[in-house]
Amino acid sequence: MTESERQCGIDEAGRGPVIGPMVISLVCCDLSFLKEIRVKDSKALTRKRRSELFEKIMGRCSVRYRILHPKDLNRMMAAESLNKIEEDEIVDLLRYADDLVYIDCYDVIEERAQEIIQMRSGRQVVCKHKADAIFPAVSAASIVSKVIRDAEIDRLHDRFGDFGSGYPSDPRTIDFLKKYLKENQDPSEIVRIHWSTVQRLLHSEKNQKKLF
């Protein structure tokens, strides 16, 4: 691929949290432009730098994204795995992509994910772990996904209070979950109820209620 050619990439943000949405983005752009603005994996950038690059990417590149809110994920995960959900969204996004698309691989086996996506979409793809650190278009997609998810998390913070990052490793998130699950019969609006962390807390709460 020459510097003047376009590159397409797909990446997600928010796959692991117990609170908030997962965002999956497709970016197709001139490779020379992506290198000029020095995109890199969103996790290696400050929030300010991500926002700056986000504006440049949105202004010059072809961008599509999907926001899967907790209620969407809860409904889908009643019947499908998270991998299958992400696979479905990727296949849908590929309708808007150029011929070859690089994907940050969601499966532990790269070849399996690549074969399934190519078979379902009829498109040529390359699925790689840590693709966001290898291919500029995937880096750009990771930035778009992260910035959009951060904006969604900010809105949830404004509405529900400080729940931290939303990741199960965050003590603030766990403290919020304990209180929120105790006070709300239907937590599915912001909480991913199929996550093991949530199931353990729900089970613990039910057991405590039985004691009184």
Curated annotation (Swiss-Prot):
Q: Where is it located?
A: Cytoplasm
User: What's its EC?
Assistant: 3.1.26.4
Please share the entry's free-text remark on the cofactor: Manganese or magnesium. Binds 1 divalent metal ion per monomer in the absence of substrate. May bind a second metal ion after substrate binding.
Q: Which residues form the RNase H type-2 domain?
A: 5-207
All disulfide bonds of the chain are none
What Gene Ontology terms describe what this protein does at the molecular function level?
manganese ion binding; RNA binding; RNA-DNA hybrid ribonuclease activity
Q: Which Pfam families match?
A: RNase_HII (PF01351)
Q: Give me any GO biological process, just one.
A: mismatch repair
Q: Which cofactor does it need?
A: Mn(2+); Mg(2+)
Write down the PROSITE patterns for this protein, in alphabetical order: RNASE_H_2
Query: Would you identify the family this protein belongs to, as annotated?
Result: Belongs to the RNase HII family.
Function of the protein: Endonuclease that specifically degrades the RNA of RNA-DNA hybrids.
Q: Any idea what this protein is called?
A: Ribonuclease HII
